């Protein structure tokens, strides 16, 4: 509506038309602001929820909108626009479910060949789903770490994965978490 620049980082898709998002704007963000995007998509800001905004889409779904207009949210230390190769470069080879706004970086170095090697050497592994949120980008801003408010994270651990982990522990095996987000989830 105002012609200003705006960046929307979808934190969580609630349903096809509603999502929670971080919004950066060159101008003040007012409630009920309508953001007009390409292909006749209009996003309306409904309310503020702490550091996020509840936004509503006028048509289609947020997943469709992200496929058409979305960009890979690169880590802040990478100071360049995203490229088409970033879609694969910043995603783990074992990613299956949508929902994270950033890759769980500890797993980025694994390749299909690594998992083939694990299999050939009878090294058991299993997966959990991490929905890494925007809090992963938030710095600690307080001197006393006990005063830092930690962000929440969503994850999914299937019953099959739970059984594999319990069996490994029962048999004296080691459980090695790849990354701090996995460690917190376990």
Language model: regions and residue ranges:
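Surface-exposed, charge/polar-rich loops and edge strands
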Residues: 1-186
């Amino acid at each position: 509506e105002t012609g200003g620049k705006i960046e929307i980082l979808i934190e969580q898709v609630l349903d096809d038309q509603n999502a929670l998002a971080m919004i950066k704007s060159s101008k003040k963000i007012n409630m009920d602001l309508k953001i007009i995007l390409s292909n006749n998509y209009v996003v309306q800001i409904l309310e503020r929820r702490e550091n996020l905004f509840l936004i509503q889409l006028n048509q289609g779904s947020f997943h469709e909108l992200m496929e058409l207009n979305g960009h890979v949210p690169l880590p802040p230390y990478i100071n360049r626009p995203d490229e088409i190769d970033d879609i694969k470069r910043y995603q783990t080879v074992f990613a299956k479910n949508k929902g994270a706004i950033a890759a769980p970086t500890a797993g980025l170095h694994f390749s299909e060949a690594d998992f083939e090697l694990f299999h050939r050497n009878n090294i058991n592994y299993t997966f959990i789903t991490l929905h890494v949120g925007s809090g992963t980008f938030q710095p600690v801003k307080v001197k006393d770490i006990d005063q830092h408010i930690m962000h929440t994270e969503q994850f999914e651990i299937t019953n099959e994965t739970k059984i594999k982990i319990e069996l490994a522990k029962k048999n004296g095996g080691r459980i090695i978490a790849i990354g701090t987000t996995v460690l917190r989830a376990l």
